[in-house]
Regions:
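Catalytic machinery of carbohydrate-active enzymes
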Residues: 1-208
Length: 208
């Protein structure tokens, strides 16, 4: 809002409710990476990181429903993403798979989010990418209220989960409020998201 006010003061129209971005145009998104459920287990501080075993449970739940799952990582989070993938494995006979997204810079990560069917993440930049590209999302908040950094209110394609208590966003352990969010709550929130085809939002055509 402050940036919009600054622009308005110089005669430049800016609507704080319009947060959409066009998709990044950087190559082709491989077919097997489109329409996936993206899980992004990392976050800047331990206080905002949901436990890895819960990410594993969500990955398995999605795979059991026949959905492809991509586990993404930011710099320094590759080990966490790999551990989630190894523990989740492949749901036999369901057609669902759990795979690492592989090395991704910011533009590649943005393209994957723009091409995804849905996103699950913590209070991180990936949540803002999902908002910008109109990708349905479930965002897990711990020490910080979604009123500060969450998706815009009133948009049914985004679900912000929060236990209702604030804490230390820089804490060295997962926030107690974040730990109150159970796997079943996240799975139910995913099930309640509208299909991507029913929402507005452009997808990138390319990324390899």
């Amino acid at each position: 809002v402050r940036w919009c006010r600054l622009l308005a003061a110089h005669g430049i129209a800016a609507d704080p409710e319009r947060l959409e971005l066009g998709p990044p145009g950087i190559g082709v998104v491989a077919p097997e990476r489109r329409n996936a459920t993206i899980l992004h287990p990392g976050a800047a501080s331990p206080a905002r990181r949901w436990p890895a075993d819960r990410w594993v449970a969500v990955a398995r739940s999605e795979a059991e429903r026949g959905r492809p799952v991509l586990v993404t990582a930011g710099p320094g989070e590759e080990g966490l993403a790999a551990a989630v993938v190894r523990a989740a494995g492949v749901a036999g006979g369901s057609g669902g798979t759990v795979n690492p997204a592989g090395p991704t810079d910011l533009l590649h990560l943005a393209a994957l989010v723009a091409a995804a069917e849905r996103v699950v993440c913590g209070d991180t930049g990936v949540a803002h990418l999902a908002t910008a590209f109109g990708t349905p999302s479930v965002v897990l908040f711990g020490p910080t209220s979604p009123d500060r950094w969450g998706p815009p209110p009133g948009r049914t394609i985004h679900r912000a989960l929060w236990a209702g208590r604030e804490g230390d966003p820089h804490g060295a352990e997962p926030d107690p409020g974040l730990l109150r969010i159970g796997v079943d709550v996240v799975v139910d929130a995913l099930a309640a998201l509208p299909a991507r085809g029913a929402t507005a939002g452009r997808r990138p055509e390319a990324l390899r």
